[in-house]
Curated annotation (Swiss-Prot):
This is Small ribosomal subunit protein uS3. PANTHER family: 30S/40S RIBOSOMAL PROTEIN S3, SMALL RIBOSOMAL SUBUNIT PROTEIN US3C. Pfam families: KH_2, Ribosomal_S3_C. It comes from the Bacteria. Keywords: Ribonucleoprotein, Ribosomal protein, RNA-binding, rRNA-binding. Residues 216-275 are annotated as: Disordered. GO terms for biological process: translation. The gene is rpsC. Belongs to the universal ribosomal protein uS3 family. HAMAP family: Ribosomal_uS3_B (MF_01309_B). InterPro entries: KH_dom, KH_dom-like_a/b, KH_dom_type_2, KH_sf_prok-type, Ribosomal_S3_C_sf, Ribosomal_uS3_bac-typ, Ribosomal_uS3_C, Ribosomal_uS3_CS. One of its GO terms (molecular function) is rRNA binding. Disulfide bonds: none annotated.
Length: 275
């Protein structure tokens, strides 16, 4: 089932966290959830050229805090912060509460699954061959530190009459290992032949998860245990220290002497009996 389930939902509360972080009662839950969906759709259209990876929405005490993760924060902020102020006012009008907008920069966009998927779909819309776009994205991700990547495209590839799906994988992508940090994303390319879907899985290594502190303590205790094992008992030939409170000088230990047992051989008879 690791091949079928959504990797992000499979790891929620284990190694992944929710992108909407708030609590609501039964009457307000549906309204607030719809607001989150509308805000994400609006930001996706508004910041289409800003390389936005994800949007985290928090609602502390009748306020809203929206964090936008982008590899091009300058496009989001605009000249002298004008664009982000317009964006904040529009979001405040849509949500009906005071909104604070934060921008987080993504240092390695080549390893981010959402940005990889969006890049491939943009190339497909420009009529670039899907195999070339997929292989180029895989090479860039592996070059910049990804331990594994898998990309799948499905639809009328190259304008074929019969829809099909093709996928390529490089490195390891352990989908059923819960401690594996799998970044998963999807995107759609609107071509003249129809919609082509792109799915991306990026394996970034193993994470410690909730028991991070316990495992970190265990790993730090291992070198100390190895040091104890490698320590040897002091040699018997070491110098002996005088007792505390005495003025006696340090007495060097006597070298160990091997005792040899001397066996006396009986004297040989010089005369034979009867002579």
């Amino acid at each position: 089932m690791g091949q079928k389930i959504n990797p992000t939902g499979f790891r929620l509360a284990v190694t992944k966290n929710w992108t909407s972080r708030w609590y609501a009662n039964n009457t307000d839950f549906a309204k607030m959830l719809k607001e989150d969906v509308d805000v994400r759709i609006y930001l996706k259209k508004k910041l289409k050229n800003a390389s936005v990876s994800k949007v985290v929405i928090e609602r502390p005490a009748k306020n809203a805090r929206i964090t936008i993760y982008s590899s091009r924060p300058g496009v989001v902020i605009g000249k002298k912060g004008e664009d982000i102020e317009v964006l904040r006012r529009e979001l405040q009008k849509r949500m009906g509460v005071p909104v604070h907008v934060n921008i987080e920069e993504i240092r390695k966009p080549e390893v981010d699954a959402q940005l990889i998927a969006d890049s491939i779909t943009q190339q497909l819309e420009k009529r670039i061959m899907f195999r070339r776009a997929m292989k180029r994205a895989m090479q860039n991700a592996m070059r910049l530190g990804a331990q594994g990547i898998k990309i799948m495209s499905s639809g009328r590839l190259n304008g074929a009459e019969i829809a099909r799906r093709e996928w390529y994988r490089e490195g390891r992508v352990p989908l059923h290992t819960l401690k594996a940090d799998i970044d998963y994303a999807t995107s759609e390319a609107e071509t003249t032949y129809g919609i082509i879907g792109v799915k991306v899985w990026v394996y970034k290594g193993d994470t410690l998860g909730r028991g991070a502190e316990a495992q970190a303590a265990a790993t730090s205790a291992e070198p100390a245990a190895e040091e104890k094992k490698t320590r040897r008992a002091p040699s018997k030939t070491a110098a002996r220290k005088p007792a505390a409170g005495t003025d006696k000088p340090l007495v060097a230990a006597k070298p160990a002497v091997k005792r040899v047992r001397k066996v006396e051989t009986p004297a040989a008879d010089t005369q034979k009996s009867g002579e």
